[in-house]
Amino acid sequence: MKLPIYLDYAATTPVDPRVAEKMFQCMTMDGIFGNPASRSHRYGWQAEEAVDIARNQIAELINADHREIVFTSGATESNNLAIKGVAHFYHKKGKHIITSKTEHKAVLDTCRQLEREGFEVTYLEPAANGIIPMERLEAAMRDDTILVSIMHVNNEIGVIHDIDAIGELCRSKGIIFHMDAAQSAGKVPIDVQATQVDLLSISGHKMYGPKGIGALYVRRKPRIRLEAQMHGGGHERGMRSGTLPTHQIVGLGEAAAIAKAEMASDDARIGALRDKLWNGIKHIEETYINGDAIERVSGSLNVSFNYVEGESLMMALKDLAVSSGSACTSASLEPSYVLRALGLNDEMAHSSIRFSIGRFTTEEEIDHAIEVITQSIDKLREMSPLWEMFKDGIDLNQVQWAHH
């Protein structure tokens, strides 16, 4: 068993060897290395065909038309293109946008930039289970609302939003609906024909594809218009200029095809491992699951261990590659803004760990993880004066701490 055990699949996934193999065939002189935009020779035609196949594979994963897939450098760019693209194109219709406080930074910071440009953004508060209540969303809608951006699956707590209901509500009000599907594409079934989602962001490296590639689904009927954010040769029907990276796109396509074929079996196996992990640690006193216990993606488990300091817990769990929030913000010692939005206090938010399980996780690794977690919590609490006070029946909320 290789240590540390990788339990951070929500941060990134390893490239599936079958994907890597396909990618390598598009890189060297004896492979499909041409520029897909080179229309005058065979090297370009072959590359264009490889890109077309991948575009179809991604479209099939979400039941879209291949002409609705725009390649980007990843979900961050897809989110930027969707949100800024809509805001800049439809600004005469209205300048109000709705999102939630628990979105990924790629959505929140894009919205903050638009606020600097004169747009108004409403940041919805989730319920305690991490899900945005529909009545809260509807109450925030106005005549000048042009866009709602709500993620499908949360990257920190793994809860799943009811996108059918959100899509239906937005369509009935004539509001464009963007969904960040970085954590759900390839893991949860998505059917854009059945769901009234207008824009959908996809990331390659969250579903066993390469980093640096993603896609944005842009609905054709009813047609959604975007203002390009990247200008140049007019690639991707003018929505995203830049030479298409054939090997990256082929990797994303293959990852999508594998995900579609193996989604049900992956989901069942990963879900069983997640349940095994939770059942192995839930007996530990003062241990709480964050986010909805039912409406969640199979590989995600965010747990707070009360009276244990987050950073010391991370160090104690050195045999496990886990995180205390999203990878994008884990360098900061601030408590997770997602958990704070759920109503957790700073101490509970600080003592939380995100375990995310994936395609290559084994049962043996989960058994070892349970052992490591149990021993580490026991050891840290033995050294904790707060734990001792709690065990003595002292209500720590009533303690008046002296400031020196």
Swiss-Prot record:
<dbReference type="GO" id="GO:0044571">
    <property type="term" value="P:[2Fe-2S] cluster assembly"/>
</dbReference>
<comment type="pathway">
    <text>Cofactor biosynthesis; iron-sulfur cluster biosynthesis.</text>
</comment>
<dbReference type="InterPro" id="IPR015421">
    <property type="entry name" value="PyrdxlP-dep_Trfase_major"/>
</dbReference>
<feature type="binding site">
    <location>
        <begin position="203"/>
        <end position="205"/>
    </location>
    <ligand>
        <name>pyridoxal 5'-phosphate</name>
    </ligand>
</feature>
<protein>
    <recommendedName>
        <fullName>Cysteine desulfurase IscS</fullName>
        <ecNumber>2.8.1.7</ecNumber>
    </recommendedName>
</protein>
<dbReference type="InterPro" id="IPR015422">
    <property type="entry name" value="PyrdxlP-dep_Trfase_small"/>
</dbReference>
<dbReference type="GO" id="GO:0046872">
    <property type="term" value="F:metal ion binding"/>
</dbReference>
<feature type="active site" description="Cysteine persulfide intermediate">
    <location>
        <position position="328"/>
    </location>
</feature>
<feature type="binding site" description="via persulfide group">
    <location>
        <position position="328"/>
    </location>
    <ligand>
        <name>[2Fe-2S] cluster</name>
    </ligand>
</feature>
<feature type="binding site">
    <location>
        <position position="243"/>
    </location>
    <ligand>
        <name>pyridoxal 5'-phosphate</name>
    </ligand>
</feature>
<feature type="binding site">
    <location>
        <position position="155"/>
    </location>
    <ligand>
        <name>pyridoxal 5'-phosphate</name>
    </ligand>
</feature>
<feature type="binding site">
    <location>
        <begin position="75"/>
        <end position="76"/>
    </location>
    <ligand>
        <name>pyridoxal 5'-phosphate</name>
    </ligand>
</feature>
<dbReference type="InterPro" id="IPR015424">
    <property type="entry name" value="PyrdxlP-dep_Trfase"/>
</dbReference>
<dbReference type="InterPro" id="IPR020578">
    <property type="entry name" value="Aminotrans_V_PyrdxlP_BS"/>
</dbReference>
<keyword id="KW-0479">Metal-binding</keyword>
<comment type="subunit">
    <text>Homodimer. Forms a heterotetramer with IscU, interacts with other sulfur acceptors.</text>
</comment>
<keyword id="KW-0411">Iron-sulfur</keyword>
<feature type="binding site">
    <location>
        <position position="183"/>
    </location>
    <ligand>
        <name>pyridoxal 5'-phosphate</name>
    </ligand>
</feature>
<dbReference type="GO" id="GO:1990221">
    <property type="term" value="C:L-cysteine desulfurase complex"/>
</dbReference>
<keyword id="KW-0963">Cytoplasm</keyword>
<keyword id="KW-0408">Iron</keyword>
<comment type="function">
    <text>Master enzyme that delivers sulfur to a number of partners involved in Fe-S cluster assembly, tRNA modification or cofactor biosynthesis. Catalyzes the removal of elemental sulfur atoms from cysteine to produce alanine. Functions as a sulfur delivery protein for Fe-S cluster synthesis onto IscU, an Fe-S scaffold assembly protein, as well as other S acceptor proteins.</text>
</comment>
<dbReference type="InterPro" id="IPR016454">
    <property type="entry name" value="Cysteine_dSase"/>
</dbReference>
<dbReference type="Pfam" id="PF00266">
    <property type="entry name" value="Aminotran_5"/>
</dbReference>
<dbReference type="InterPro" id="IPR000192">
    <property type="entry name" value="Aminotrans_V_dom"/>
</dbReference>
<dbReference type="GO" id="GO:0030170">
    <property type="term" value="F:pyridoxal phosphate binding"/>
</dbReference>
<keyword id="KW-0663">Pyridoxal phosphate</keyword>
<dbReference type="InterPro" id="IPR010240">
    <property type="entry name" value="Cys_deSase_IscS"/>
</dbReference>
<feature type="modified residue" description="N6-(pyridoxal phosphate)lysine">
    <location>
        <position position="206"/>
    </location>
</feature>
<dbReference type="GO" id="GO:0031071">
    <property type="term" value="F:cysteine desulfurase activity"/>
</dbReference>
<keyword id="KW-0001">2Fe-2S</keyword>
<keyword id="KW-0808">Transferase</keyword>
<comment type="similarity">
    <text>Belongs to the class-V pyridoxal-phosphate-dependent aminotransferase family. NifS/IscS subfamily.</text>
</comment>
<dbReference type="GO" id="GO:0051537">
    <property type="term" value="F:2 iron, 2 sulfur cluster binding"/>
</dbReference>
